[in-house]
Amino acid sequence: MTSSLVGSEMCIRDRSTASPSCVTDALGNTACYAYDPRGRKTAEYGTALQPSVFAYDDADRLVSLMTFRVPGETIAADPQERTDGDMTAWSYDDASGLMTAKTYADGHGESYSYDDWNRLAVKRQARTVDGQGTPLATSYTYDPQTGNLVSVMHNDATPSLNYVYNHLNLLTQVADDSGTRTLAYNQYNEAESETTAGLAASALNYLRDGLGRSSGYSLHYGEGIVQQTAWEYDGCGRLSTVSLNNGDDPFVYGYHAVNGLLETLDYPNTLRRWYTREEKRDLLTRIDYLRPGSANYPAKTDYAYDALGRPTEKKDYFNTPAPGLTHSYSYNGRSELAADAMSRGGTYSYAYDNIGNRVTSREGSGASAEAYTANNLNQYTAITREEGASFAPAHDADGNQTKIQTSMGEWEVSYNALNQAARFIQGNRRVECRYDYLNRRIEKAVYEGDILMSKKRFIYHGYLQIAELDAAATESAMPVLRKTYLWDPLE
């Protein structure tokens, strides 16, 4: 073994592999690793890690992973001899090396088959689609000349996906549950526009400057442009301004003269957000909101951290010289939140098992304690409360939670072949959701019995929602634009 001290960490290395064998952090917590003669990691454990055991085949492919719950005992020693873990296993085709199955600790899992070109052809899940036990399956079809994926189909009611490409193998059209989406490119093969026909008929045009950098976008809906953004950059290539709908007063970004990190953000309404950071770790220590002429900060947040960079204190100021709310955070050796002591509202406290499932929690002064029971898939099967009704979550064979509890009570949830929540049911109340090819929710409809109460549709820029439409009256009129959203490109 060899050892070295780096900063406030000590690292002991395995002599035969030179890989870390035990790392002790600044607070004395240990992360230990074991290796086999071929240098493959076979276990990790210690006071700073959740214990795990790994096994491999002769081709160095991972064939099993064992994790441990064992509530009431903190496993810090080498777990390789333990037999009380939960195992996930992988199977492979001997000839190709392709993964053919993944099996979870309950015996359920997924299986995969491939075509003659070793491309995924069919994925079979644990759920079934009929009384004969036919597995829920997804089939993938490819262009015989280019090899591009052209369709994804399912043997249940989940809508299919269809793709079209140009001669450069760039995606030009997608047909999904939202309708048809057409993509266009400029002479540099950069995305130029995205036009959607269907549930939310709209056009999104992407803008670029002379250097090819994104300089904003414009959203067309109905008769014209409903949102337009413009981004500019400084001489160092950093975002300098963001304007909305050709406004005269943009958002302005300022950067630290030494480290180059974001320091200020000026709002069009004269408000300024100011960031202060630690000198060496660049961790945020303060976020100030400044308004000209104000005696106090409209809002301010102070942060403190421990030696591992974990937040230990957060002070929130609300237009007052003294903090209105203070959070004091503490952690266990595995960096899981153990307590949040608030200056008002009491303390939130949590305990965990060896894989990170909650075992107990108490949230706030006067709150009753809750105890959690987890199964071998790390799914909660029971939440028992000292006061009030307990709750027993349920899951389907693919691990999706089918019984949930919200502030509005308990709901039954069903999922499609892509494991997207498609329907929520509570008595005669029903919520139905639809998704596009990027797994973005594009419609949410709420029913009371057979009566439609509301229907909303959503438009996205990437994964960010930028518009909300009211589609409750789509039988007689096109959806009405209700909201648009502007997002900070740096966040």
Describe the function of each predicted region.
Residues 27-29, 48-50, 85-86, 106-108, ...:
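Short, small/polar residue-rich loop motifs at catalytic or cofactor-binding pockets
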Residues 18-20, 34-35, 97, 162-165, ...:
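Short, ordered secondary-structure scaffold segments
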Residues 34, 321-339, 394-434:
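Surface-exposed extracellular loop regions of Gram-negative outer-membrane beta-barrel proteins
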Residues 13, 22, 33, 54, ...:
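A residue-level detector for well-ordered beta-strand positions
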Residues 8, 23, 33, 41-45, ...:
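Beta-strand-dense domains in secreted/periplasmic systems and polymorphic toxin scaffolds
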Residues 70-85, 127-135, 294-295, 321-322, ...:
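Intrinsically disordered, low-complexity Ser/Thr- and acidic-rich flexible linkers and loops
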Residues 1-14:
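Single conserved hydrophobic/aromatic residue that forms the stacking wall/gate
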